[in-house]
Amino acid sequence: MLLAIDMGNTQTAMGLFDGDELVQSWRMPTDRSYTADEIHVRLMGFFKMYGLSLDAVDAIAFAGVVPQLSREWHAVADRIAADAIVIGPQTAAVTKLRAARPQAVGADRVANAVAAETFYGAPAIVVDFGTATNIDVIDEDGYYIGGAIAPGIRISMDALAARAAKLASVPLEAPEHAIGRDTEECIKVGSVVGAAAMAEGLVARMKRELGREDATVIATGGLAGIVADSTDAFDVVDGQLTIKGICEIYRRMQELG
């Protein structure tokens, strides 16, 4: 089985695949202080919770933005005698990139592009709501060509609470109205509905620039479900898109030999 790992700045998403089938998925906080020992213990706990055996994992594929944790995950792979592969330059042969600097494109964005083309077809636009909000554009030939990066919803809310003396931190949840009735609801509207409106505006412009109004729009990331309640801009909400892309890249690498 393959364990696909998407290491974000805030959360680490994991998916266990048996071939192309997603057997189980988990999320845990991304903690840069974690050692291989701590990661191993957490993994054993997740697997035990669902009656799964860590011994069944014969490969681990990583995509992430936290280099020091990649080293710890490699150590875990060694412990369980699993092959390890990192999404990056070594997997370039099975990905399609037309960005100005392909080597600088984040591994999670590459995985999103691969999954979007594979499972939903091209052209496509992926809106990934995580620590940052990433928008990735895949052209009609299936190539990643670029996109946009904006501050994530939680970053924006935390900055507002930190810099505005009378505005406290509020729960991150979708408001019921577009017109806030009190300060807390106003912050939710500005943050969540504002993120939805930003996505709507950027997606509309990108579709025009592509010349393809029919591009499939996919929302993913840990906060996609919250934002999706405030907009009809998304054709698909797939919270597992990135780990599915990691699995697909691994499968292609195996076929390549």
Residue spans for each PLM region:
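Short glycine-rich, Thr/Ser-proximal phosphate-binding strand/loop in the N-terminal lobe
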Residues: L2-K48, G142-A168, A174-H177, E185
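Conserved phosphate-binding catalytic cores of ATP/NTP-utilizing and phosphoryl-transfer enzymes
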Residues: A93-A124, C247-E255
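ATP-binding/phosphotransfer module of carbohydrate and carboxylate kinases, centering on a glycine-rich
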Residues: L2-A4, T30, S156-G257
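Phosphate/pyrophosphate-binding loops at sites that engage ATP/ADP/AMP, CoA/4′-phosphopantetheine
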Residues: L43-D58, L202-A215
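Short beta-strand scaffold segments in enzyme catalytic cores
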Residues: T12-L16, V126, T133-I138
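Short glycine-aspartate micro-motif
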Residues: L2-D6, A61, A124-D128, I218
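Short beta-strand-loop/turn "lid" adjacent to the catalytic site in phosphate-handling enzymes
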Residues: Y50-V105, D141-G147, G152-I153, R181-V192, ...
